Amino acid sequence: MKNENMRKHRLRKPHNTPDPKLDYLLIGVVILVAALLRLWKLGQVPFMHDEFSALLRTRFDNFHDFIQQGIMPDSHPIGVEAFLWFWVRVFGWSEFWVKLPFALMGIGSVYLVYLIGKQWFNRKVGLFSAAFFAVSQFTVFYSQLARPYSAGLFFVLLMAWFWYRVVFGTKTTTKDYVGFALSAWACSLMQYFSIAQAGLIFLTGLLFLPKERRKAYWLSGIGAVVLFAPTLPIFYQQLFVSGSIGGWLSAPKPSFLTDFLQYTMNYDTLFIFAVGIIILLPVILGRRSKRSTPLRWAGIAWFVIIFAIAFIYSLTREPILQRSTLIFSYPFVIIVAFSLFKNRTLSPWQNALVVAVILFVGCASLIMTRRHYDLMYHQGFDQIAVEIQKDKEEFGDQIQFATHTEIGDAAEFYQAKTDIENRIVFNRYSNLGEFNEWLYDHKETPMLGFGWTDYVHPIWEVTAVGNYPYLIEQKDWFTSRYLTLSKTPTENSRYVLHTLDDKPYPYAKGQEWGRASVFSCDSLPDDVEALGIVAHIHNETEISNCMVVIEIRDAESDSLLFWHSTLPEDGHFVAGDNAIANAIIFDNGLSPKGKKAKTYLWNQGKKPLVLNKISYYFTRKDPVLTGLYEPLN
């Protein structure tokens, strides 16, 4: 019996012996997949809002103005902005060349995840972690953006790799300490949460550092701080003078963390299940690693601390927590999650099967479930320009075009490449009164192509529809929409306003209030996103401060739940026929069910006019509008 057991042991042992050559082949495949996913038609990925925010700062002629007027008012360290300032002077504003360095650092980050997993635990952990990182939309998305996240992630991982060599390595060299210092310095130039992550890594090292290495370790840290010192005025200006690094965000929901984890697994049930089973496989097989190591706790602590700081700050001061905030600490959670694998838990070919499953299911979910190569490669700035060109070719001089966007130059970047002249771009500083004036000046044009990006307030869309109520076509992209509209019925068009009252009602001189219209919000579809009201009026003389009011009331008690009016300065209209609009957004804090809407004209200027008709318009939630971050179904 003893001999038989020994024989079985000898037969089983080589079966699970690691095969370094196969491991090298597998990591090569992982890197190849990561490269394909990030570099695939990279030049066709249009610039996004955040990228334009950075690129437009590079237009300063000299570096001094770039720092004073471009960097100081921003909320990011100088690193990526300064790199782009030099980079675009060599390669221009080509999407491929601007994005390429960040895609390459994203690929490099996948390899660094492998190295750290192997360094901290073993090759299996590195392979599986890198495979997951290669196919997660979270990392693919940020690798295709010319923003600090891919670069910051790369340098955080590089610092962590040097950190292990300095703190736990059997032999350390001067190169290790220099690499540790330089990578820590690079982290400080990328993003404020990469600075926080670098600080956490450094402080953690103090808990485990051998006594004889403390001097060199502190010198490395001091060296990184000295290198960072020239940018301290920028750091001070952005954090303590400007006083905001994220106030434009909304407060995080209680479900933020679970939503984030699903996002990193591509919101795909099969991918989540496959990764979950693989992580638990050592437990299921009874071959999990029982080795006690502080690195598991360190990896988890880094993520938890960063998340807790951002979450608490977002609730108590101003919102700063977003998905990108966690990109610098998340890799360590993934490495720890796969750390139950021992070197001999699986055979080499079983390792290959696990890697293949992660890559195949991850790629399938990225491409099909998340539609990444559709949504990422077709976005508002470029696609609105495409639709404008198509509509111009089809309708000629019968159509005019208007676009609203946060950054006017971003829309202009793509629209300037068309041959369209009868178009206008409104930006964040434009007011609705300007749009009304432009519409009136061009009222003889029978059609309108109207686009918006960056989730502009729906009152702009309602105003466009109020003047051109027949919808020919609507197209949505990530945070963007384009409508082809007409004043009169055309082939394949539909009237999108819902009449509430079309009996003319005159307002005499000095009259401020008039008739109200009420309707049940239960008549709206379940997926309604915004409600708009359009009042069509006729005024013989110029009027001002004429607004539409929307009240949302409880259907049973009639208690007022929400009140909204347009701005008085937007209520200026020249003599003639005009459309006055207002809009509200339904969200978790204001749902339409069990409510009624009351709407009326507030003639604050008390000029005579006639209210000819009042109608409502609604928009529906389209998952595509948030599809790069949220589930598509």
Task: Please place each PLM-identified region on the residue numbering.
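N-terminal compositionally biased, intrinsically disordered segments and leader/signal-like regions
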Residues: 18, 174-175, 419, 542, ...
